[in-house]
């Protein structure tokens, strides 16, 4: 079989022999779940082969067992060879270890003190973990590993952080443990009361300074390696009033959502936790169901004003409750909290980024209410944002009994992602993307990396400049890469697909949109214009391609989009790569002859840093089981099209010279759009006339008959009642 047979089927249908196009598939390679190295159990010498060491003893029936368990805590799971037990074994491993890499056949996990923290918080004991590992392991367990699990397992779960009437206490049934914590030099200065014993329960406790909660949790977690569990007996708490709310009868949870919530709740207790679900897999409904289960005062923290509006509308859609009990707090909407009843408050990270002294009077008044109240549940959307210095203080500003962190991409490019283990809690559930894809809960995506040669003028200029800024402009604006984009857009539009083209270079984004007569959205585009463009893309078959800058990375949900083409990006950001793929992960009802129904293209210039950035960006997706097909000779296909008379904008010499001049003049207009990442405003509506104008402008003709309805952002961000049926 030719290597080209792994490329999308519609790319294989060509006049050129398939043998003349070179492709390969980038294999899955295990990588760390964060930049900070995971603390291994013991040290492995460089070049040490785990499977030839003398202490690596195989059992006689090892061929019938699925796991290789190494002395340093690494576990290799032969999932492809044991499909009949893949699900229960996989669930066990996710509970006790960090998933490092889960391609189709062999999965890799790592046991750490922090994964044991998660396992024991779920009610598992050290002996249960060891017994199950021994049962499935091909080899005898290393004594070093068993001692490690027993030692840490005996301490984890014995220490709790409890919020009681706005005061924080550390509790433990073991006197020696709580004395160790109380006497630790980083914790002792923040102690407010001596250790006391409750004679009825036998629990020892002492109070700590509420302003030092983060420092105390960090010291217990990092230095003592004895994480403080945060659990809340919400059903027995008479101090917090309840909200009359319940899921509507038409709201149905998917099995993996139920599974994740089952791990968060145990009887009357709710555990603070992280839940990781892919984009488009229903993170919001998972959080809403948690709030309905607890029925207490709840805060939802998210990234943008649009996301605030989306959460509000989803509460109204999925939950039977008084709509007046759902309050929003944004820069443009500051509604005081009701004093006579509990509520659901939805706000943004940025609202908590400043001290009260620097807020407006109305903002300060609401924020003071937030600080003074005791919250039952804090839901943190896009939780990977929280460890940032600007936002992490919200974890202590909001005094919540229970915290739930939600994300699709538990990755950052700094060392801070691990801090979520003590800021929020352990990761109790992480969905397997490939499993959800196979069951149809998310789209089946084919990922393709297209290598493009630099044109001679651009390559010469690239070699003759020492400016990294100009070099980046040149390989980003490589005419052959832009021509490949133009070709792919034409190809997919002919197939009836809906295409998003991402480009972080704003001047290039505008130039491409203008020359190809497609609409674009970036930070300078008005809210009214953004809404009109998105509406037309959603509801008209005359607008099938839109160009987006990084404003489209978050808070945009276009369920019918099924193709992403990436021209430029933010260096090696794994998070951005996953978020952009997430734009096309909503489930689709159709598939091509190879079984795919969505396509993700990353276009890169050969022999430039762009190739290295692309490989770095793909690591998170590769760890989730995605394989990137690499087409290394795509330029030949373009040349054959040109020879047949097809015209491409950026292969015109005049256009290419103009683009080269812009790059050399340093007009790489990469705007800082972090302050304006809204794709649409929740209070903005679009008229039929505006939609017709957009369609006429970019389709070359009058618009088809409009629907006659005014569209709000909820319908444009996935807020449709049939979505979770």
Locate the predicted segments by residue:
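Conserved helix-turn-beta segment of the N-terminal RecA-like "Helicase ATP-binding" lobe
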Residues: 306-332
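Conserved SF2 helicase motif VI
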Residues: 410, 571-600, 617-618
């Amino acid at each position: 079989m030719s290597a080209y047979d792994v490329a999308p089927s519609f790319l294989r249908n060509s006049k050129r022999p398939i043998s003349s196009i070179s492709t390969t598939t980038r294999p899955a390679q295990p990588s760390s779940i964060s930049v900070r190295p995971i603390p291994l159990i013991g040290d492995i010498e460089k070049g040490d082969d785990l499977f030839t060491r003398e202490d690596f003893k195989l059992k006689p029936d090892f061929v019938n067992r699925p796991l290789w368990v190494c002395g340093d805590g690494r576990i290799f799971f032969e999932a492809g060879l044991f499909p009949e037990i893949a699900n229960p074994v996989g669930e066990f491993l996710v509970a006790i270890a960090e998933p490092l890499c889960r391609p189709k056949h062999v999965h890799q996990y790592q046991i750490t003190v922090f994964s044991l923290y998660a396992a024991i918080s779920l009610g598992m004991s050290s002996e249960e973990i060891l017994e199950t590992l021994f049962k499935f392991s091909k080899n005898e367990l290393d004594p070093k590993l068993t001692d490690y699990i027993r030692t840490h397992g005996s301490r984890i779960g014995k220490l709790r952080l409890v919020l009681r009437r706005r005061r924080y206490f550390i509790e433990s049934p073991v006197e020696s443990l709580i004395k160790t914590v109380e006497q630790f030099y980083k914790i002792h200065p923040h102690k407010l009361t001596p250790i006391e014993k409750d004679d009825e329960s036998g629990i020892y406790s002492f109070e700590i300074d509420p302003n030092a909660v983060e420092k105390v949790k960090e010291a217990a977690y990092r230095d003592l390696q004895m994480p403080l569990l945060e659990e809340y007996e919400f059903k027995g708490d008479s101090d917090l009033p309840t909200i009359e709310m319940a899921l509507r009868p038409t709201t149905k949870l998917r099995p993996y959502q139920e599974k994740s919530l089952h791990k968060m709740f145990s009887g009357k207790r709710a555990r603070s936790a992280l839940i990781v679900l892919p984009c488009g897999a229903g993170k919001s409904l998972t959080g809403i169901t948690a709030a309905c289960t607890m029925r207490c005062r709840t805060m939802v923290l998210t990234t943008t004003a649009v996301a605030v509006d989306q959460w509000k509308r989803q509460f109204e859609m999925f939950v039977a409750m008084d709509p007046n009990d759902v309050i929003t707090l944004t820069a443009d909407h500051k509604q005081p909290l009701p004093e006579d009843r509990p509520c659901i408050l939805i706000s943004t990270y940025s609202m908590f980024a400043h001290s009260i002294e620097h807020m407006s009077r109305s903002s300060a008044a609401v924020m003071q209410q937030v600080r003074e109240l005791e919250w039952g549940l804090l839901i943190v959307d896009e939780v990977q944002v929280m460890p940032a210095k600007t936002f992490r203080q919200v974890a202590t500003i909001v005094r919540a009994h229970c915290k739930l962190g939600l994300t699709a991409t538990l990755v950052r490019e700094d060392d801070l992602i691990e801090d979520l283990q003590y800021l929020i809690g352990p990761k109790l559930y992480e969905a397997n993307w490939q499993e959800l894809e196979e069951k149809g809960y998310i789209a089946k995506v084919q990922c393709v990396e297209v290598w493009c040669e630099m044109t001679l003028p651009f390559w010469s200029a690239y070699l003759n400049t020492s400016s990294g800024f100009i070099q980046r402009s040149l390989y980003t604006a490589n005419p052959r890469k832009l021509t490949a984009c133009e070709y792919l857009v034409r190809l997919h539009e002919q197939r009836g697909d809906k295409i998003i083209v991402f480009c972080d270079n704003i001047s290039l984004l505008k130039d491409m949109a203008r020359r190809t007569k497609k609409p674009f959205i970036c930070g300078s585009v008005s809210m009214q214009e953004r809404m009109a463009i998105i509406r037309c893309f959603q509801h008209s078959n005359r607008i099938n391609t839109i160009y987006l800058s990084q404003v489209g990375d978050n808070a945009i949900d276009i369920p019918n989009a099924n193709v992403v083409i990436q021209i430029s990006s933010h260096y090696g950001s794994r998070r951005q790569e996953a978020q952009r793929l997430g734009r096309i992960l909503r489930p689709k009802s159709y598939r091509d002859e190879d079984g795919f129904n969505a396509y993700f293209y990353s276009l890169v210039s050969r022999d430039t840093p762009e190739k290295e950035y692309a490989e770095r960006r793909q690591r998170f997706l590769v760890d989730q089981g995605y394989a990137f097909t690499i087409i290394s000779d795509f330029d030949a296909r373009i040349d054959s099209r040109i020879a047949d008379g097809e015209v491409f904008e950026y292969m015109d010499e005049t256009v290419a010279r103009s683009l080269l001049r812009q790059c050399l003049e340093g007009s790489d207009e990469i705007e800082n759009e972090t302050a304006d990442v809204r794709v649409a405003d929740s209070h903005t509506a679009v008229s039929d006339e505006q939609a017709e104008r957009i369609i006429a402008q970019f389709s070359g003709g009058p618009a088809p008959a409009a629907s006659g309805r005014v569209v709000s952002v909820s319908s444009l961000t996935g807020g449709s009642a049939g979505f979770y049926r």
